Amino acid sequence: MRVLFAGTPDVAIPTLRALVGSRHHVVAALTRPPARRSRRGHDEPSPVAATAAELGVPVLEPRSVRATDVAEELRALDLDVAVVVAYGALLPEDLLAIPRHGWINLHFSVLPAWRGAAPVQHAVWHGDEVTGATTFRITAGLDEGPVYGVLTERVRPRDTSGDLLARLADAGPRLVLDTLDAVADGTARPQAQPDDGVTLAPRLSVEQARVRWADPALAVDRQVRACTPAPGAWTTLDGARVKVGPLDPVDAPPLPAGRIAVERQRVLVGTGSAPVELGRLAPAGKGWMDAASWARGARLAGDATFGADDG
């Protein structure tokens, strides 16, 4: 089949590579336009754009998919199907009607759970033991379309959202290829999503990533792992922002929420229940460092407390 691939970040690359190596023909890659993606200060192509160019796939980088020339370009491609992996923009209905077999999305949850932009982060934050990925046909509703296939993946106890997303991104291409092969062969039987079990996963804001030290240790641990690497867990110390890496709940005497205690080369922080051990952090304007090294040079007051000025 003639396939349009739509995606933008690194997690979309395994599927793009798999499609290019498959029986199907990737005629173009639709991706978000160049943007500032690092501290270099200039716009850079998306990871998908760079990979598509490497693979010899023509790249489409419209500022808006609602522009009339985008629909014209897609019609000219004579598309059988479009595959979406984290494109990063909502598709208007006139575009959805262009490919003969519609647009098939690889979504990183087992639908109807965690519909929305941040399914992996929400799965980690809510302590899900199992999640997965789903291929479904995109419709006008938010991740509501009929399902072609599902895979499942265990959420490991120390997974960050980045860890889990990387595994799903590597497992997803097989599901996508199986789905496309079934569509091409006429054996695909998409099933409507059930009405029960629907949960929503909106994008996490920077404010939601502010560590809530007054919550129980388990909740704090899940919050930080869910926000790692994005949007990035953080707190404050003496009015300055500090990035916080994954934590480890420990068996230690309780501390006031946010209180910092240095003990035997460990940096402990109080929560609403038991303390947690801080492994890494990044003080304002500095790179990541291990917490023990930071504590040795930080000249902490005896009552130093993360988040004391949160209000």
Curated annotation (Swiss-Prot):
<dbReference type="InterPro" id="IPR005793">
    <property type="entry name" value="Formyl_trans_C"/>
</dbReference>
<dbReference type="GO" id="GO:0004479">
    <property type="term" value="F:methionyl-tRNA formyltransferase activity"/>
</dbReference>
<dbReference type="InterPro" id="IPR044135">
    <property type="entry name" value="Met-tRNA-FMT_C"/>
</dbReference>
<dbReference type="InterPro" id="IPR036477">
    <property type="entry name" value="Formyl_transf_N_sf"/>
</dbReference>
<protein>
    <recommendedName>
        <fullName>Methionyl-tRNA formyltransferase</fullName>
        <ecNumber>2.1.2.9</ecNumber>
    </recommendedName>
</protein>
<dbReference type="InterPro" id="IPR011034">
    <property type="entry name" value="Formyl_transferase-like_C_sf"/>
</dbReference>
<feature type="binding site">
    <location>
        <begin position="109"/>
        <end position="112"/>
    </location>
    <ligand>
        <name>(6S)-5,6,7,8-tetrahydrofolate</name>
    </ligand>
</feature>
<dbReference type="InterPro" id="IPR005794">
    <property type="entry name" value="Fmt"/>
</dbReference>
<dbReference type="InterPro" id="IPR002376">
    <property type="entry name" value="Formyl_transf_N"/>
</dbReference>
<keyword id="KW-0648">Protein biosynthesis</keyword>
<keyword id="KW-0808">Transferase</keyword>
<dbReference type="InterPro" id="IPR041711">
    <property type="entry name" value="Met-tRNA-FMT_N"/>
</dbReference>
<dbReference type="Pfam" id="PF00551">
    <property type="entry name" value="Formyl_trans_N"/>
</dbReference>
<comment type="similarity">
    <text>Belongs to the Fmt family.</text>
</comment>
<comment type="function">
    <text>Attaches a formyl group to the free amino group of methionyl-tRNA(fMet). The formyl group appears to play a dual role in the initiator identity of N-formylmethionyl-tRNA by promoting its recognition by IF2 and preventing the misappropriation of this tRNA by the elongation apparatus.</text>
</comment>
<dbReference type="Pfam" id="PF02911">
    <property type="entry name" value="Formyl_trans_C"/>
</dbReference>
<dbReference type="GO" id="GO:0005829">
    <property type="term" value="C:cytosol"/>
</dbReference>
